[in-house]
């Protein structure tokens, strides 16, 4: 997931699929596209993904927790939306869920009306990048989900949609003996949505069995370590790559990983670009990944704001 248009040039080099999401773009991922590990859809699969639907609605309702009445209305609408697709290759989408909520609301269910009102702008309005059927091309080597134009109110929904999409690709790859790698930039996006956090934690732990390797990236390690659930991401990770940090984050990592003075210095904000520290199963390794400016990859990874803006402007002008 690319939130800052940092991966498009790398994607171009590998001829990746690079769908762009957000207002004015046609790319769409169906956040309700799910199946079992063998590609089928059973009622148990719908039931097992209850947290996904709750997370979707809470993100649409600006993070407000659903009441018991709203949870019941949502469950009824979800089951009704999926029922025609059980055992079939087709899947419902958010427009179907919206339609079921409206139908229930017209029958007098006030909670369904509230849910439909919250969902409406994500189905019929400017935030509909995840409302319809999936229409993006999948590259077997690399896919860049470009999210730089996805607004703040859509970000949790975007994450849920991508996780669902990657889950299906991971199941398919597993059936063909292939591994799947997911780089999740700005993983702290979902920290304030408890159901979405549950989805992420389940995804992070369970999808390992199906050959998924997940790389979570954040510039806010303190936000991860201070979160009661997100801190478990650290506990269940075997490899850490730390780049130079601000002092507060540097101190936190030093305490947690018992860094020596020289290791601590490698994480200071003034350390050379491309250097840092790698921790693998407790073993600490100094990292020097500086790239020669003459190397073609130098400009691919160059995030200097002025140079990057010029590159992006030139690319958009083509």
Across the structure, where does each feature detected by a protein language model lie?
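C-terminal regions of RecA-like/P-loop NTPase motor modules
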Residues: 224-318
């Amino acid at each position: 997931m690319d939130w800052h248009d940092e991966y498009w040039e790398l994607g171009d080099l590998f001829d990746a699929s690079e769908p762009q999401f957000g207002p004015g773009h046609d790319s769409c991922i169906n956040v309700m596209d799910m199946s079992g590990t063998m590609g089928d859809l059973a009622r148990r699969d719908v039931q097992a993904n209850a947290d996904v639907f709750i997370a979707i609605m809470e993100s649409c309702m600006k993070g407000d927790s659903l009441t018991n009445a709203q949870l019941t209305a949502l469950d009824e609408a979800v089951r009704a939306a999926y029922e025609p697709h059980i055992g079939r290759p087709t899947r419902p989408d958010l427009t179907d869920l919206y339609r079921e909520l409206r139908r229930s609301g017209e029958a007098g269910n006030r909670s369904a009306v509230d849910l439909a009102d919250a969902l409406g702008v994500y189905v019929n309005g400017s935030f509909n990048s995840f409302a319809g059927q999936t229409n993006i091309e999948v590259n077997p080597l690399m896919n860049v989900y470009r999210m730089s134009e996805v607004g703040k109110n859509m970000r949790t929904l975007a994450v849920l949609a991508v996780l669902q999409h990657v889950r299906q690709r991971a199941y398919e790859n597993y059936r063909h003996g292939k591994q799947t790698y997911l780089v999740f930039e700005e993983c702290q996006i979902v920290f304030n949505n408890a159901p979405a956090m549950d989805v992420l934690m389940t995804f992070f732990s369970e999808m390992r069995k199906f050959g998924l390797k997940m790389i979570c990236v954040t510039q806010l390690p303190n936000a991860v370590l201070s979160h009661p659930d997100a801190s478990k991401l650290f506990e269940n990770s075997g490899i850490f790559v730390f780049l130079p940090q601000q002092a507060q984050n540097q101190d936190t990592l030093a305490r947690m990983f018992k860094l020596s003075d020289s290791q601590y210095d490698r994480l200071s904000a003034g350390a050379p670009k491309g250097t840092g520290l790698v921790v693998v199963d407790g073993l600490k390794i100094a990292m020097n990944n500086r790239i020669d400016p003459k190397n073609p990859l130098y400009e691919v990874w160059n995030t200097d704001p002025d140079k990057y803006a010029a590159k992006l402007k030139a690319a958009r002008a083509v």
